[in-house]
Every structure is written in structure tokens, then in C-alpha cells.
Amino acid sequence: FHQRPQQGINDYFWMNHDGQGAGVKNFDIGGVQFDVAAVSQVKSCSPEVMADETNPSRITCTGSSDTGDNGHYALTTKTHNIKAGPIDVEVYANYGFDSKAVDSDARLEAWQGGLVLSHTNDSGVNKVILRYSDNSDNSVYNKTDDLTTVYASFEGSHKFTQQAQVEYLLAFHDYDNGKDNTDNRKNYGAIVRPMYFWNDVHSTWLEAGYQRVDYDQGGDNHGWKLTLSQNIAIGMGPEFRPMLRFYVTGGQVD
């Protein structure tokens, strides 16, 4: 696992650079910390049974990953532990490139920058996430020529009491391919999840979500979803795992 910041309520990795490599984390200079790494994307593999009896397992690979890389590389950086008054600041900058394992006419470069501003108090946390990507979306491994994407979100949580809490998120994603606009779109989303914790074990959640996708070609798409769940966990709070959930979901998409 490497540089995979995730938003919980919409289960989105707004950056993801899992792979093989090396780097340094939390290198401290005057209180500001730096993460730097060079990583390669692992080559995918379809497991097959081989006839060669010299291989005890007789399986080419496990899961969907091989042991080598596929020629897509990333240099990733994160600068954090920055204080701007009551605001915590994180800055991301990543660069993607290809090796000779990729055909010369298919090699591309990509880069992305990200900014996270967060504020924490006794009642909860609020966070703003901004990401700009050139020739990529949420990973500089996966490159598309002349693609520009922007992601912005506001998320947070608030404790009215220890038992009554709410999580919320607003998100925007702009996908703009300058060479092929057939899939160009702007995505708007909103989620709210009020939660009530009856005790350290049982809780009830009601989650409501709405999404609108505005395509350059093909019009708009709207959808909503409502989920009611009864949950069992060891600990009072949405972060405790494992959690056993019993839920019913309803929704509609145009």
C-alpha cells in the first residue's frame, strides 16, 4: 500500500499509488515533515494452471498481480505537519512516467498536485480536499493523453453528543479529455449520514446520497440512495471495526 488517501463516506481513493518501491516517510525539517518515494505499478496477471510439474503450486500467480512491474512509475511526495493558525495543511505533488517496458509511441508523462486543509475541534473535524491532475485522474500510473481532471470536496463530522453524530460530504469531479470528449463529464455528489449510538455495541445510521453527472454529450444523469442500517461493533463510534451491519437500501437512477 502506498499513498492511498481515502474518503470514508463515499469510499473514494482520491490518490492511489500502490506498488513496489522505496522511500522515506516523516523526514522532519524544522517541524515540517516530508514523505518521498519512487514506486512502480505491479504487473497484472490472470492466474492459470501450468502443466509444468516442477512448479509445486502449478499456478502462474495468485490473485490478479504478478511479481514484476508493468513499466509505469511514479515519484510521489507529501509535505505535512504544517500549521496555518488553526488549520492543518498537507501538500501532495506526484510525477508519473513510463520505462522502456512500454512501447515508445505509448509512453506518457503525468503529474498531479493536491492540497488538504483540515480543522479539528472537540466536536469533530472539517476537511477540504483539492486535486488537479494532468494526463491522469487519481493515479499518475494510469495515463491518458490530453486528459485534465479536477477533484474538490468538503467533508466532515460533528458530535452533537457522544451518542448523536453526523458525517457529511460534498464532492465535485471534472473529467475533461481534450482529444476525445465522448466521456467528458462533471460529477456532483452529496452525502449525509446521521448516526445514533445506543450504547458501546449497537447503533442506528440513516444515510442519504445524491449524485448528478453532467455529460458533455448525452445530457444529465441523476441518482439518489437512502440506506437505513442497524450496526453491531465493539466501541462507540463509526471508526470501530469489525462491524456487523443489517441494512435496507432504496434508490433510483435516471
Where does each model-flagged region fall?
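Residues that cap or initiate secondary-structure elements
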Residues: 42, 97-99, 136, 236, ...
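Predominantly the C-terminal beta-signal and adjacent terminal strand-loop region
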Residues: 220-254
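A general structural signal for short secondary-structure junctions and capping/turn motifs
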Residues: 24-25, 118-120, 236
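Detector for outer-membrane/organellar transmembrane beta-barrel domains
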Residues: 80-215, 222-226
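Outer-envelope exported proteins of Gram-negative bacteria
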Residues: 35, 169, 205-207, 243-247
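Outer membrane beta-barrel
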Residues: 1-54, 58-92, 245-253
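Generic domain-boundary/flexible-linker signal
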Residues: 47, 102, 179, 217, ...
